[in-house]
């Protein structure tokens, strides 16, 4: 079975899903890493490849490819909740808190192949690939992404005395 058909079967009937529903459904895709290969895009307008492969009124599914030593911007997902499963490599997920126009780093952790990360409504984060191999992940958001906010990362300034 092709990835699109698996997604339709697994996600097509979901109505107003929770983060747990999204994670459970993602993990049900058989051979997700292999089935996702034809949908992996190289970077174009962003520092990473992004391919929206499925969308209905309830959710949107995207394949993300972050090349070695690249990262996303610091962002939120608007009014959407989400879940992402790492299919290849590992990613560093950095959580931020808003300080107005800027965002301040709060916490970071690695997500390894086969593991999921969740995004609750209002979560601000950045995904990075600090390794020498690409990182590929499969993301599902509900409702479909709209009105995302990109934040300027607040860097620590060290003073010389």
Swiss-Prot record:
Gene that encodes it: cdoA
One Gene Ontology MF term: cysteine dioxygenase activity
EC code: 1.13.11.20
Keywords attached to this entry: Dioxygenase, Iron, Metal-binding, Oxidoreductase
Residues engaged in binding Fe cation: 75, 77, 125
Pfam families: CDO_I (PF05995)
Remaining remarks: Although there are Cys and Trp residues in equivalent positions with the residues forming a thioether cross-link in the eukaryotic homologous sequences, no thioether cross-link is formed in this protein.
Cofactor: Fe cation
Catalytic activity: L-cysteine + O2 = 3-sulfino-L-alanine + H(+)
Protein name: Cysteine dioxygenase
Cofactor binding remark: Binds 1 Fe cation per subunit.
Presence of the UniProt keyword Metal-binding in the record: yes
InterPro entries reported for this sequence: CDO_1, RmlC-like_jellyroll, RmlC_Cupin_sf
Organism superkingdom: Bacteria
Keyword Oxidoreductase in annotation: yes
Field pH dependence: Optimum pH is 6.2.
Family membership noted in the UniProt record: Belongs to the cysteine dioxygenase family.
């Amino acid at each position: 079975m092709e990835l699109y058909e698996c997604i339709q079967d697994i996600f097509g009937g979901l109505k107003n899903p929770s983060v747990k529903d999204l994670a459970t459904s993602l993990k049900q895709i058989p051979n997700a890493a292999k089935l996702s290969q034809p949908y992996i895009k190289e970077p174009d307008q962003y520092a990473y490849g992004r391919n929206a492969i499925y969308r209905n009124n309830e959710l949107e599914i995207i394949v993300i490819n972050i090349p070695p030593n690249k990262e996303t911007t610091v962002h939120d997902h608007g009014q959407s909740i989400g879940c992402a499963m790492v299919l290849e490599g590992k990613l560093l997920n950095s959580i931020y808190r808003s300080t107005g126009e800027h965002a301040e780093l709060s916490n970071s952790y690695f997500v390894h192949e086969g593991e999921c990360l969740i995004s609750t409504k209002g979560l601000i984060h950045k995904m990075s690939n600090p390794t020498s191999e690409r990182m590929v992940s499969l993301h599902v958001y509900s409702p479909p992404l709209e009105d995302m906010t990109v934040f300027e990362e607040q860097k620590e300034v060290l003073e010389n005395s």
